Amino acid sequence: MVPEQSLSVVVPVYNSEASLPLLIERLEPVLAAHAPSFEVVLVNDGSPDGSWETVSQLTERYSWVRGISLMRNYGQHNALLCGIRAARNQIIVTLDDDLQNPPEEIPKLLAKLAEGYDVVYGAPEEEQHGFLRDLASRVTKMALQSAVGAETARHASAFRAFRTEVRAAFVSFQGPFVSIDVLLTWGTTRFAAVRVQHDRRRLGTSQYTLRKLIRHAFNMMTGFSVLPLQVASVVGFVFTVFGFLVLLYVIGGYLLRGGSVPGFPFLASIVAMFSGVQMFALGIIGEYLARMHFRMMDRPGYAIRQQTAAVERAAPRLVAGMHA
């Protein structure tokens, strides 16, 4: 039997006014059956629709629902970080707002967590995303491998459960570029995954765009990994060796066969190739320098516009915990 512990469910909200009431209705019986106390933290990530109004209505109807509204759209992981820091219970569960992660699958994650793991992912038996979301998932996992390793990255998903103690590892993290999965690896190596059902999206449309996909994957690789720098170093080394071999070939041909040294077109192509490699490497270095610049500016990962009363009453406790 799984020992009961208090639960906090954190849900990033974006343009989901239609699905939120259904999500809460399905969460209530699951949480009531598996936790002595529980809460749901809905973080509105600058939704332009009526999502915040829906969140406010839900907090009035359910005493265990709390709401936070951010100043603008910061991104899913930034909103999650805000909600995770606001969570007050022993176990934190994160899931999307689109009902593709069935709340009824939460007990599977809790059961695996009870075996001694610190973080458990719900790995979909068969993903039911659209093309862009599937592509986003694949690219993100590839980028995540460079930061956390292939084993963890393979099972990473937005449906996860972890012990609140893990949060202590990134309680002082600051910066605009956030990856919850990388931050979790700062606190533990005890990861596991269980197979869960993954439903088709029936309400609304995916908010993933090609621009968001590229931005998140690039943030993953340059924000929490040195892989791009390593790749640039290897590419630079390979082209250096290539240039050296070309030089030997030209000199050898001139000395042994008496041939003429290739003219301007050949030399121009070699110079252009090496200049391109140098610019590529400088661009990557510049990206890292820019990120250092942003962190030195103390640019926050999110800013809160307003909170429901339940969150405001908990604020003194939260601040004390963050600065302990």
Model-flagged regions — what are they?
Residues 36-47, 68-69:
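Short beta-strand/loop segment that forms part of the nucleotide-sugar
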Residues 92:
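Short aromatic/hydrophobic "clamp" motif used to bind/position activated sugar donors
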Residues 44-53, 99-100:
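A conserved acidic beta->alpha catalytic loop
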Residues 1-4, 179-324:
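Hydrophobic helical membrane-anchoring modules
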Residues 8, 37-39, 66, 118:
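Structural signature of beta-strand start/N-cap positions in the alpha/beta core
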Residues 1-29, 35-36, 318:
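N-proximal low-complexity "stem/linker" segments adjacent to membrane-targeting elements
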Residues 57, 64-72, 76-86, 100-183, ...:
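Acceptor/aglycone-binding surface of glycosyltransferases and processive sugar-polymer synthases
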Residues 18-21, 49-58:
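Acidic helix N-cap motif at the loop->helix transition within catalytic regions
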